[in-house]
Amino acid sequence: MSTTFQTPSRLPTVSAWDQFCEWITSTHNRLYVGWFGLLMIPSLFVSAITFMLAWVAAPSVDMEGIREPIISSLLGGSNVITAAVIPTSAAIGLHLYPLWEATSMDEWLYNGGPYQLIILHFLIAIWTYLGRQWELSYRLGMRPWIAMAFSAPVAAATAVLLVYPMGQGSFSEGLPLGISGTFHFMMAVQAEHNILMHPFHMLGVVGVFGGAFLSAMHGSLVTSSLVQETSSLKSVNTGYKFGQQEATYNLLAGHAGYLGRLFIPDIAFRNSRSIHFLLAVLPTIGIWFAALGIGTMAFNLNGFNFNHSLLDSSGRPIRTEADLLNRATMGLQVMHSVNAHHFSLTLASTESKEIPTIPIMTS
């Protein structure tokens, strides 16, 4: 009797690094992490935590660099509307200002150091989120248009938080992080660059408002042309199941049958892909142009200025909308002057800073 011994086959060993790579790139996770997510997640947490702390409890910040600090936190007396994270002081300019560059924590807070910390980590987070969108689309075999559409708001945020301050020479010119601060930034940009008369801003308005109009129109047509699957005694919503393959609405009935009769029949949409393509492209291109407009005005390529009124044959001015806009812009310029505290009036700090004086010798 002979006995045969079979050598067991050795299982392939999987290293910890391979397991980590498999988990990072797996599309079966509840939330896809991805390689971009390794940078996005910590950057987003740092930005969000710092923003919440600064929004609630930050001390006053010398935004203009003239030792007249502005208080903007909730604990400093502001409310939800007026609270904001004040930009880094003009005394810092465009210098990178991490915590270890200041002599103390108080100095770092007084010069608006949290603002740089927030926006730089936030920009890293949103750009890596865009990359994460592309990465997941690639893993699933999808086309990259989702990431392309998201590039528009990413470009807009980059324009107001980084490109514009760099062009103007100081982070103090950036967008304050708050509701009142956003309106302050809008008025300041209008005062300095006449953005309402810039063609790129006009294209941005057309894209955003046009996209909103098309979205409202398409959504109302869809909900008005649902295919009836139930009797008139039951709600139309009970005839559908989430994720079903059959169409739930009649595109031709809504766009060609209804909208075509209201407008011009030949321009009514008869293809679902064309209407959804336009819904994505119009606001995306519009926001791209708006971001490009901020980028050009950052380097003082401003909107059109009509500094002289039209005159009639008698030499009297003919008042137009351009004159009204010029007067409003001049008023905003006065409001945005260094010593005028309109961001906002309730935000002026009561703290007094002692400024050393230099004696002047007279003969």
From Swiss-Prot:
Q: How is it modified after translation?
A: Tyr-164 forms a radical intermediate that is referred to as redox-active TyrZ, YZ or Y-Z. C-terminally processed by CtpA; processing is essential to allow assembly of the oxygen-evolving complex and thus photosynthetic growth.
Q: Where does a quinone bind?
A: 218, 268-269
EC supergroup of this enzyme: oxidoreductase
Stabilizes free radical intermediate (site feature) positions: 193
How the cofactor is bound: the record states: The D1/D2 heterodimer binds P680, chlorophylls that are the primary electron donor of PSII, and subsequent electron acceptors. It shares a non-heme iron and each subunit binds pheophytin, quinone, additional chlorophylls, carotenoids and lipids. D1 provides most of the ligands for the Mn4-Ca-O5 cluster of the oxygen-evolving complex (OEC). There is also a Cl(-1) ion associated with D1 and D2, which is required for oxygen evolution. The PSII complex binds additional chlorophylls, carotenoids and specific lipids.
Q: Where are the transmembrane segments?
A: 32-49, 121-136, 145-159, 200-221, 278-292
Which GO BP terms apply? photosynthetic electron transport in photosystem II; response to herbicide
> Where, subcellularly, is it found?
Cellular thylakoid membrane
Provide the primary localization: membrane
Q: Which residues bind chlorophyll a PD1?
A: 201
List site positions: Tyrosine radical intermediate. Answer: 164
Which amino acids does the record list as binding chlorophyll a ChlzD1?
121
Catalytic activity entry: 2 a plastoquinone + 4 hnu + 2 H2O = 2 a plastoquinol + O2
Q: Which UniProt keywords apply?
A: Calcium, Chlorophyll, Chromophore, Electron transport, Herbicide resistance, Iron, Magnesium, Manganese, Membrane, Metal-binding, Oxidoreductase, Photosynthesis, Photosystem II, Thylakoid, Transmembrane, Transmembrane helix, Transport
Question: Mind telling me which HAMAP family this protein's record contains?
Answer: PSII_PsbA_D1 (MF_01379)
Other facts: Cyanobacteria usually contain more than 2 copies of the psbA gene. 2 of the reaction center chlorophylls (ChlD1 and ChlD2) are entirely coordinated by water.
**Name recorded for this polypeptide:** Photosystem II protein D1 1
Recorded source organism is Acaryochloris marina (strain MBIC 11017)
What's the name of its gene?
psbA1
